[in-house]
Amino acid sequence: MAAALVGVSMVAAGTLAGVGPAAANAPGHPGTPSAPRTVFTEGFENGEGAAVTPLPDYTGAAPQGQTYAADPAWLTSCNGLLVSQQAPASPPAGVNCGGFWAANKQMAAALGTWAGGDAATNHSLTAYTSGNPGAGRTELETVRPIPLSAANRFLAFSVDAAAQNCFTNHPLLAFYLLDGGAARAAFSSPIDPCQNPGQVIGGTSVGTYASNGSVLFSGDSAGIRLVNEQASGNGNDGAIDNVRLLDATPQLDQAFAPARLPVGAPTTLTFTITNTSELAAKNGWSFTAQLPAGLRLDGGSAATSCGSGTATADAANGTVTVHGDLAAGQQDCTATVQLTSITGGTYQVCGSAITDAVGVDLPGCASVTFTAPVFDARSHGVRLTSPLLDIGPLAPSAHSCTPLPGEDDHSVLSAGLGSVGTLGALTTDASGTIGADGSRTAAAHARTAGVNLLGGLITADLVGTSAQARQPLTDNGPGAITLTGATTLTNLRVAGVAVAADAAPNTTIGLPLVGSLVINQQTPIAAGKGITVTALSLTLLTGVHVTIAQSTAALLTTTDPCPAS
């Protein structure tokens, strides 16, 4: 049939490209129409040979085994006959074809040539009116319902038609799709092969004609009715072949752009509704998309280019609902909505998330990845390193190497550091939190009581630290990181001398013949994305290093290395 579709002319619609048993629109090709799927076709060839068969006596091919009816006016006076070029030279008795029998055979042969088949054996339904049939009479109607794959499908039709004697009254073929007892027009004007031939073969005008409209069926079966609007029997001579019922349901696709971005930054979810290749009008389709938890819709951002359609975003429920139309000749249209997420991760939307789909084929999957800052919150009560022995970290707490919120805390009652000294209770915690506004905070705390080092050279009732890294969320993603760090000193004494509770950061005290002590040590880390605060950092000449009450807080990117504890 492909050859027949080149140069097809249209009355009822634009040309029908690629009609055949091709698959319906497949997801993944937004904006590129695919051929409509053939639901039913009748070529009037089942069991036919040289003999002439009246339309009511014909049964179509299995599994449908379709039969046909017509108004009496279209079953008499040389009408309603299945004819081929190989039919007998004389018409069957009682068909009243007079001297026009050969013309019936010529039209069947011309339709066979047009379709790229065998002109001699091709059968067509012919009508060479030798009387006035009257307007609006049914020339062909399916008797058995044609099953559909599902409800809420757009249906269209296609037919090969021929006509002779175009100098007088033309056949005017009006096709209807039957929805239960209702006949629904799938055209804007009747097919007139005389006025719009795809080709003239031996004096016979022929063409393939597709509906420029479509019918949205809610049921699971359909029928076809051909009504000839020409009342006169003067002229009105024609034939039809290759009647097709087409599932011309548009394809829905969905895509995110950009598909990878920071949390808080907006991405656009685009729904593309792509017509089938006959480009008939598709009015009244609709669907609702349910987005996964974690995505935040911009309720005022929904928009559509789909005719007089509407697009609405329900931010509270995470749904997008679209109603729209495709005009005749329109390849596609779109609906868009903006959204974001304050939680890092990959979110996928698939066809299973589309509910209340009417007149669209479900899409494939689309995904978007939001990259989130990574929490790095760590603390410990004490750690000792030396050339011979390491102790700790003791009472370590950590919430690190994850974009997800969480917390950790630990404590011990006391700690011994060998010849270096003793400590009382150690308590620590570390956490990562996400605010309702999307801001992220990494925080850590450490407290060490009962400090007694180097035989009383360094003592304190309590030392503690806190570290925090906070990052707000802006309309374009994570903002600048704010770092804070503090040290608590209660009755700290070094060599019997009291140290101010508000000692400045990185206060260093030399310990002659012993080493040095840094108080309220504050060190930026991760290229300024974090801070480490240590209450007491003791370095001995023997190579021993002790950190007491240390807290670290940072907000890292996904490309930063995961920190050691």
Report residues per predicted region.
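Extracellular carbohydrate recognition and processing domains
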Residues: A182-F217
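Low-complexity, intrinsically disordered segments enriched in Ser/Thr together with acidic residues
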Residues: T138-P145, V206-G213, H323-T346
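Surface-exposed, low-complexity/disordered Ser/Thr/Gly/Pro/Asn-rich loops and linkers
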Residues: S77-A151
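Extended, solvent-exposed, non-transmembrane regions
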Residues: T371-S565
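Short beta-strand elements of extracellular/lumenal beta-sandwich folds
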Residues: V263-N283
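Extracellular carbohydrate-recognition regions
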Residues: A26-K105
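A surface/secretory-pathway sequence property marking extracellular, secreted
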Residues: L178-P193, S286-T321
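Extracellular carbohydrate recognition
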Residues: G136-T138, E229-A248, G359, H545
